């Protein structure tokens, strides 16, 4: 009997060893799968040519076949992982190198004469920052787009939503320091609103010289609308007009309204956990390292509310689609998110004292506010108050009845038509868009 049990145990040991080896290989396969995951994104989310993608696929398979011949030991596993890391890093590098903005083509797929579609670095304040420059005719007026944030990147979003602006403008989309492709352009810990203003000024001087324009238009959305006011206030001689949408006016009052709104929403739906969280952190202002996290607690509530509001026409951004845009390499896609956490937290706490109702009541350029009626992220009542106080050579407050914080997304057609068929017509001669 003892011998029988001994023989059974002897037979079970190889099975246990085999099962253990299989489990160990599965455990090793999990981090390897995570390591090579970026390579799997190349075909659908980057501009890396197919031939280069095939080379990376061959490298992965070749390395796997080669290393598997040497057995399964700790040393071999470490070498295997190191090889996959090296291949993945090369793939990430390739995605950065080949990132580009799509060409502007006619119906036959040919490049349009005099068109421009480039993505390039420009030196601003001693740092290399990125821009896209797009337009069907490089002789058209120049329009500088200032993205939301701070830390936000909207290269792909703006290209897709505002494509028709390229018919009448040279549209320049600036990747601000600490955002997207310019995430590492500067020491983010030292970023200030003034740095954005001076960089924008230097960029405009560059654009004037490059395109032979005395003045440019500026379109700012959300944070970009506040930055735009600051820039045109300091350098009015450089601008044909300012267009603000999702207009930020007074940051502290704005965010306290958002906080109260979010708290009320949570109370109405009986979400006591969210109520407790909001009450624990209290209303803004916030300072320190968790500004972005605390601000997100109520700002996400406002965006979720607008996303569910049937009065708003187009419910907003397609973040996954934007992340898949050809302008972003794989590292840029990571910084798409990092900018809205790291950079936002650093800069936003420096904006609590900004109130244009006190600090910018007189501007020397034509002003246009394109405002969503249902915006609960930048309350329109603050924009109305500012508009009534403001003196300018020309000013208009234009309502978008089916929009929230982003009329340029919610009512794209009307937004573009307003800029081209109304604003551009007033400021200069141009044919109406069909």
Residue ranges and their predicted role:
Residues 155-156, 178-191:
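Glycine-rich "HGGG/HGxG" loop immediately N-terminal to the catalytic nucleophile
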Residues 166-183:
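Conserved alpha/beta-hydrolase
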Residues 195-215:
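Conserved acidic catalytic loop of the alpha/beta-hydrolase fold
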Residues 272-358, 365:
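Alpha/beta-hydrolase
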């Amino acid at each position: 009997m003892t011998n029988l049990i001994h023989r059974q145990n002897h037979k079970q040991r190889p099975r246990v060893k085999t099962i253990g080896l299989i489990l160990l290989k599965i455990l090793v396969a999990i981090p390897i799968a995570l390591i090579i995951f970026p390579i799997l994104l190349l075909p659908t989310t980057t501009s890396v040519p197919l031939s280069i993608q095939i080379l990376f696929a061959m490298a992965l398979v070749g390395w796997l076949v080669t290393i598997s011949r040497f057995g399964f030991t700790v040393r071999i596993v470490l070498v295997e992982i190191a090889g996959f890391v090296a291949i993945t890093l090369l793939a990430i590098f390739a995605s950065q190198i080949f990132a580009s903005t799509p060409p502007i083509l006619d119906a036959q797929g040919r490049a349009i004469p005099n068109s421009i579609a480039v993505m390039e670095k420009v030196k601003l304040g001693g740092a290399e920052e990125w821009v896209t420059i797009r337009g069907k005719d490089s002789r058209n007026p120049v329009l500088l787009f200032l993205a939301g944030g701070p830390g936000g990147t909207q290269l792909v979003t703006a290209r897709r939503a505002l494509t028709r602006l390229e018919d009448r403008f040279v549209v320049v989309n600036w990747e601000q320091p600490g955002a997207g492709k310019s995430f590492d352009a500067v020491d983010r810990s030292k970023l200030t609103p003034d740095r954005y203003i001076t960089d924008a000024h230097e960029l405009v001087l560059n654009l004037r010289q490059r395109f032979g324009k005395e003045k440019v238009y500026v379109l700012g959305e959300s944070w970009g609308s506040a930055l735009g006011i600051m820039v045109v206030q300091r350098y009015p001689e450089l601008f044909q007009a300012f267009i603000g949408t999702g207009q930020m006016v007074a940051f502290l009052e704005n965010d306290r309204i958002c906080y109260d709104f979010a708290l009320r929403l949570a109370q109405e739906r009986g979400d006591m956990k969210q109520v407790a969280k909001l009450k624990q952190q209290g209303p803004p202002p916030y300072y320190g390292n968790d500004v972005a996290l605390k601000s997100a607690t109520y700002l996400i509530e406002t965006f979720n509310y607008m996303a569910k509001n049937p009065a708003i026409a187009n419910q907003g951004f397609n973040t996954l689609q934007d992340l898949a845009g050809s302008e972003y390499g794989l590292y840029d896609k990571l910084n798409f998110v990092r900018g809205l956490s790291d950079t936002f937290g650093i800069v936003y706490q420096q904006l609590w004292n900004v109130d244009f109702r006190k600090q910018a009541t007189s501007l020397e350029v034509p002003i246009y506010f394109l405002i969503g009626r249902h915006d609960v992220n930048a309350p329109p009542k603050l924009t109305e108050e500012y508009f009534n106080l403001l003196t300018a050579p020309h000013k208009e407050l234009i309502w978008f009845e089916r929009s929230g914080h982003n009329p340029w997304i919610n009512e794209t057609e009307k937004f573009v038509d307003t800029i081209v068929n109304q604003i551009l017509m007033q400021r200069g001669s141009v044919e109406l868009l069909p």
